[in-house]
Amino acid sequence: MNEPIIIKSKETINGVKIRYLKDGEYFFKNLGFHNYFYIKTSDFIPNENDFMYQYHNYVAKTSDINGFTKIEFNNNFKRYFARLFWEKRCKTYEADMRAHKRFLMDSNFPLHNEEIPYLFFDIETDDRKNLRKDDRGNVLPHKDARILSCAMVDYKGNEFYYELKEDNAESEIILLQQILSLFSKYGIISAWNSKKFDMPYIKNRLDLFHINYDILDYVNHLDYMELFKKYDNKSRKSFSLNAISNEVLHESKIDQEKGNGKIYETWKNDKEQLKRYNIQDSKLILKINLQRAFIEVSCLRANNAHCHVVDTVQNSHSGDYLLLREYKNQGIIMPSEPLKDEILERRKKGKIGGGHTTCKKPGFWKNVKIWDFKSEYPSVITTFNISHETYVGTIYDENNIKEYLTDEYVVTPPDYEKKYHPARVYRKTKKGVIPIVVDFLVNERDKIKYRMKIHQHELNKDGTKNINYNPDLYKKEYLEQYAFKTDGNSIYGAIADACSRYYDWEIADSITTSARATLKYCYKDLEALGCLVLGGDTDSTFTIIKEGYTVQEIDDRFVKILQEWTDHWHSNNNKLVFEFEKEFDTMLFCKKKNYGYKNLNGEIHIVGLEAKKSSTNSLAAKIQLEYVEQVLNEKYDPVYWENKVEELHDLIFDQKMNAEELTLVLGLNKLAKDYAGYVIDKKTNLPKIKKDGTIQKKSIPGHVKLAERLIKDGHSIDVGQKMHYIVIHDKPILAITPEEFSLGTGEFPYVDKKKNDITFYFEGDYDSKYYWKRLLAPLIKVAYFYHGGLPEWNWNVTAGELKKLVKEKDEVSD
């Protein structure tokens, strides 16, 4: 008989309720379990009488454990209130956990998350009404905006489709019950942007009709768009399902107009079209997962941490399971996760030092070699035995470092990055808990990677057939090692997160400081060899190696110098590996985290440049990308580009840009009222004074002004929403919607430079000067760094404007 597959669990008043799958059937099981937390006994004794007077009916028992009092509850729902009682009097320990989390933490039975059946879904809704959003950005559908259809495809490719039969409550209730019934047959459900749209929409409609959906508490919901962003970890102009499907699958969504009742009209008049459109969306998500397998990665990570799949969405949650379990094994009781006031207090300490990213040598380069730290932060943690219980203190005076370079201690190197980050001291006589966890994750990953090499290639290096070649096993092993890698890299985040029980500013800063100092040490050694270090990105370096050296020689050298480096700081467990990773055929380096490169396969990649940003208008992005591609392909033609600038100028000033090229997109981070106040001078930290002697007020961006006008006109606009707009006048800026622009004429309220309220008469023109500068800014950035200065083309701006554009080349951002 197969072991049960644990789907999800939930706290009950006197235990835990578990949903599990066994032999193809779902079951629930109620288990008795008393939740508990700890108080230092020295704090418990003087407050015991008051506490027991209020909570004696809910406390099962108390017991003393190594200076702590363990309080067990016979009513798990009183744990939160009991915590508040103690928080007013003293520090609590592990008092934040609900019973189901504590139960998983205390147990060791296998969960088998990798065997959970999963389902992809997509809903279509009545789009005749404007959508509203709550403070968290979740959709709030209008009470009359029904769900029209729901398409679902499971992990085996089975398709399901339910539709609204009639536009009435009875039909929608049936549809909702069908959706809920199918959801209940799976352990994981996922859709694209479902955290903000599909799931809150469905729950809102269920609430409206008073339909019980407790079953969803026992189903893991994963937003696949969030998974894609998390695990793919690349910047893109758009994360729409259509954009990602085109990129990953070279497939598109089925054409279908949306908004202003278009979906509703299709439901009324062409139900087959709506069905095709709806099902295709779910099938696209399935196909993306077949390639990327992010559901499977999430399941494997849940196994690593012994938690539910939904707990892997946030690294801090799965990381808590990983770390707290080992602290428990070591007999160490940890603090509770902080409450709001403590989080705010922690954040006052300021930002923890970040990674070392630099651009030392901007320009165009060929044959660029990249060296990269293997698991940089995990390796630093293990090398310097960084953990809460091993931390001794901080050394602010470097003259005092020597006294700690002994057999008992290891010292982390200091570093200067905008400000001084001091050395820290850790005991090395006993391995820390965090290094134990990190070592386990890294070592397990290394074992799998070794096996992967055996199964990866069909042919051996000598051309003979590889009898161990197994692409299916290779993919399985790849997912397993990727899960371990993600978990290993997430540990630092738990220490640096102000909301975490593991947060410690000194410890987190010692990790990033050690990493920066070590990377800079490697830079210096490369430069001492005569290599040209162009710059780097957190854990890597872009280098032109000196003629006469080989990659292997430099790899061997790094083994030697990193051992010397860690010996100097008295580490007895060096795990630092700085090794050759890859080579760029060509590279255009503009500034840190802003570059383009062509790999040895001829593929071009863009990092950080405006061509990849959603806020860049499409024409500017297209032009910058074309320029970079010409440069990287070594087909750059300066005459072509000099003429191109003239052509673009004529295109823009002849009013020939189309609405798509004109449309700008920016997120609405705050409303107009939040822009009140004055511009602060960075040098004086006082309000900036204009030439006429008046104080310079903060200007309100065009998309914010547009949002304010639309709200006044009765439109539903929420903070966090993406605003699509076209600028028809600048200084002061006036923006309208693409739909308003397409009408060709219009009258809009406007406040001119003299603060007069006037009516602006729109006659179909956009502001040519505004768009010209927006197009030039990204182009000037790449042209400037390729040429080592700005080419003397006719840029069609004044000398002052050109000077400003060149000055802002390092800050170009739409």
Labelled PLM ranges:
Residues 1-180, 184-185, 211, 279-280, ...:
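DnaQ-like (DEDDh/DEDDy) 3′-5′ exonuclease domain used for proofreading
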Residues 199, 211-214, 224, 230-231, ...:
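Catalytic nucleotidyl-transfer cores of nucleotide-processing enzymes
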Residues 541-560:
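Catalytic palm subdomain of template-directed nucleic-acid polymerases
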Residues 265-385, 466-517, 521, 535, ...:
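Common nucleic-acid-contacting/processivity interface regions adjacent to the catalytic cores
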Residues 555, 559-814:
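C-terminal, non-catalytic extensions of nucleic-acid polymerases
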Residues 300-312, 396-400, 462-464, 505, ...:
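A glycine-rich phosphate-binding loop feature that marks nucleotide/adenosyl-phosphate handling sites
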Residues 145-156, 189-190, 194-275, 280-283, ...:
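Metal-dependent phosphoesterase core characteristic of DEDDh/y 3'-5' exonuclease domains
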Residues 253, 518-538, 543:
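Active-site palm subdomain of RNA-directed nucleic acid polymerases
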